[in-house]
Amino acid sequence: MKRVYTLLLFVALIFSLTACSKNLVKGSIVSQSNDTMAQLDIMPQKLFEFAEIGDIVVVIAGDFKEEMPLVDELIAEEGKLQLFYDSNEHSLSICSYNQNFFETYNVSPDAKVEINKK
């Protein structure tokens, strides 16, 4: 019986540690059909359970680590690297917005992507 309580305590501890983690979502680049967009296989809906448009997030993709705002079309700023939410496509991309087009950071297709709210 003591082992059961110990096991339950251990499971509760692990759960509480992961529940308090600021890690939002993990994924990888799944398609980069052209140089304008790199879509991530992470669900924006899952991201928005934790972060909102305008929040600063830390994006880690392979060796790349950058702090950037989570933006949509309305608040994208020219020349700044941003985590961009496309409401039409319901996709996320890491990009720099310049004169109505995206310049996407070159991320390896097999790179794991981790997004943390700052």
Give the label of every model feature segment:
Residues 6-14:
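Hydrophobic helical h-region of N-terminal Sec-dependent signal peptides
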Residues 17-19:
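C-terminal motif of bacterial Sec signal peptides marking the signal peptidase cleavage site
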Residues 1-4:
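Positively charged n-region of N-terminal signal peptides that target proteins for export
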Residues 21-96, 102-117:
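Long, compositionally biased stretches
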